A protein has these predicted regions:
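N-terminal pre-catalytic "stem/leader" segment of glycosyltransferase-like enzymes
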Residues: 1-53, 57, 132-133, 240-246
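Conserved catalytic-core segment of nucleotide-activated headgroup transferases in glycan assembly
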Residues: 119-164
Length: 246
């Protein structure tokens, strides 16, 4: 790769927009490690790096031919309200890594100290997309369509888990499986011993038709994801970009 991508900063939606400040702190760290140039969304070109899909970033992604996307990590995620000392995922031309490929387990062991044994609870947990991802990915009827599909293969109760109601950490104890389009809450559930099914083509895992006998070979998936997330210091030092270019 000869040309470095432009790093796209976001613009605040209002005075004191903390999300904007966090986004730009992350992008500035990546730009430092890249040795590249930062621009605002309206100046973004065909090859970009950006954080999230809000504040102009999503529009820049849709216009780009190639993009590197930064967002919350898969495991040991950075707390947006804190010091940003956790992990962030970075992917090329996708919002998530597919989880495919063969990777060592050393980084997984670094971010996950204990994998809980397989749970066999009663409920199927549905984790819908956020309102922002729902709009960006055109997933407006995802819940209805997915529940209809689940009911073809299982008569188990289906609980909808959001950040406001039936939070994942509250319902995972009695879960048989978690079904989501792409939510990282499913990765948390997998670590806690619950099989997962992800329906998004970019990170497809498991099949709804197998929900009564779900896949649970989680080490390959978790190992792959652990190798595709980095810290703020990894970005700033250039380590993240070096590994992404391989």
């Amino acid at each position: 790769m000869t040309d470095k991508p432009l790093v796209v900063l976001s613009k605040p939606r209002y005075n004191g927009d903390k999300g904007y400040m966090m986004n730009n702190r992350i992008c500035a760290a990546f730009s430092e490690g890249l040795g590249g140039k930062t621009v605002y969304p309206e100046e973004a070109g065909n090859s970009i790096v950006t954080y999230g899909i809000r504040r102009g970033s999503g529009e820049a992604i849709k216009r780009a031919e190639n993009f590197w996307y930064i967002d919350h990590g898969y495991m040991k995620r950075s707390d947006p309200s804190g010091s940003l000392n956790g992990y962030f995922r970075i992917t090329k031309n996708s919002l998530w890594h597919s989880g495919k490929g063969e990777y060592p387990t050393d980084r997984l062991k670094k971010v996950v100290s204990h994998l809980e044994k397989r749970r066999r609870g009663r409920n199927i947990i549905l984790a819908p997309p956020s309102k922002y991802m729902r709009e960006f990915l055109d997933l407006h009827n995802w819940e209805e369509k997915t529940i209809e599909e689940i009911k073809k293969y299982s008569d188990r109760p289906v609980l909808i888990s959001t950040k406001e109601n039936n939070r994942m950490n509250e319902v995972v104890e009695d879960a048989w499986a978690v079904v989501t389009d792409h939510s990282n809450s499913a990765i948390d559930a997998l670590i806690k011993g619950v099989p997962i099914i992800m329906t998004n083509p970019a990170r497809s895992y498991g099949k709804i038709e197998d929900i009564e006998n779900p896949e649970f070979d989680r080490i390959p998936l978790l190992s792959a994801l652990s190798y595709n997330q980095w810290t703020l210091e990894d970005m700033r030092s250039g380590k993240a970009w070096k590994e992404l270019k391989k």
